[in-house]
Amino acid sequence: MLTAQDKQKIIKENQLAESDTGSPEVQVALLTARINDLQGHFEAHKKDNHSRRGLLRLVSQRRKLLDYLHDKDVERYRSLIKKLNIRR
């Protein structure tokens, strides 16, 4: 589970401007943190299919944001996947 401090740290690291909280970079970074957190959960709870469906929803949402960013600005897209270490 991400704490408020964790979220603020992620936002601070990925924001484009001082008040930026909704750019695709910030949203993808937050989703990536939640996805990584859930992956740790599934190591202990292999049969938790209800949460697995939520994980797939988060992955799909992140994929859509990454596709949007790729179409809008390829350089920002490449730097983001490199920074977050997302395979693609």
From Swiss-Prot:
Keywords from the UniProt entry: Ribonucleoprotein, Ribosomal protein, RNA-binding, rRNA-binding
GO BP: any one term: translation
Record-level GO cellular component terms: cytosolic small ribosomal subunit
GO terms assigned for molecular function: rRNA binding; structural constituent of ribosome
Taxonomic superkingdom: Bacteria
One Pfam family here: Ribosomal_S15
Function per UniProt: One of the primary rRNA binding proteins, it binds directly to 16S rRNA where it helps nucleate assembly of the platform of the 30S subunit by binding and bridging several RNA helices of the 16S rRNA. Forms an intersubunit bridge (bridge B4) with the 23S rRNA of the 50S subunit in the ribosome.
Subunit structure: Part of the 30S ribosomal subunit. Forms a bridge to the 50S subunit in the 70S ribosome, contacting the 23S rRNA.
Family (UniProt): Belongs to the universal ribosomal protein uS15 family.
Stored NCBIfam families: S15_bact (TIGR00952)
Name this polypeptide is given: Small ribosomal subunit protein uS15
Species in which this protein is naturally found: Francisella tularensis subsp. tularensis (strain SCHU S4 / Schu 4)
